[in-house]
UniProtKB/Swiss-Prot annotation:
Belongs to the PAPS reductase family. CysH subfamily. GO terms for biological process: cysteine biosynthetic process; hydrogen sulfide biosynthetic process; sulfate assimilation, phosphoadenylyl sulfate reduction by phosphoadenylyl-sulfate reductase (thioredoxin). It is found in: Cytoplasm. It catalyses: [thioredoxin]-disulfide + sulfite + AMP + 2 H(+) = adenosine 5'-phosphosulfate + [thioredoxin]-dithiol. It comes from Sinorhizobium fredii (strain NBRC 101917 / NGR234). This is Adenosine 5'-phosphosulfate reductase.
Amino acid sequence: MTTQSLEAEAKALNDRLEGLDLAGRLALVAGLEGRAVFTTSLGIEDQVITAALGSNRLDIEVATLKTGRLFNETVALIEATEEAYDILIKRYYPEKADIEDYVAQYGMNGFYESVEARHACCGVRKLRPLARALEGASYWITGLRRGQSGNRAATPYAEADLERGLIKINPLADWDIDVIRAHVAAEAIPVNPLHGRGYPSIGCEPCTRAIKPGEPERAGRWWWENDEKRECGLHVAEAASSIIPNASSAA
């Protein structure tokens, strides 16, 4: 598919998704021609989407990135969620050789020392496994919301991911955190207990801290960096090709 046609399809799909509720948005994507993959980090937004997929028995793959540095609470939630909704969450892991190369160059916790080292860690633990998860996919469903950070304030319902050659679907783009929490409570959706301990956004354990009152939702991610647009590379335009070598071809 050409860049122009991918962007045109994304725009048309964005318009169709806007007037639908969550179940309707996911059902629309499930009915499209082509493979759809939802990648979950087991955060509260992703649990809302997983619950909707499981409850409505929609034919959309669910995948997660087992980075090797996740909180124990996150790991435990994977199996609990599978049992709750009778679904399979496919695990994607970093390659052993990639981890060994990273540790040899930067050290096990070298990501604290520089942005370059942190990007390299995200590259081997997240971006390369993500490329395998999305291989051959036409649609990538995420839990991105406009309220998560200033960097995500303009998140559409559908957007062309030109680097990966697919359309990214953000069915919760217009949901704020209060709506998310109310929905979770009403539907008794299982969530990570860390959310109740001051962690609204949860990534790898060494790179996530609880936030302080009044801080943005994602302030606890890579908190030692000064850049206000801190991201791991999964959801930014520069991401894969600038963070890991040959990532574009891998995706």
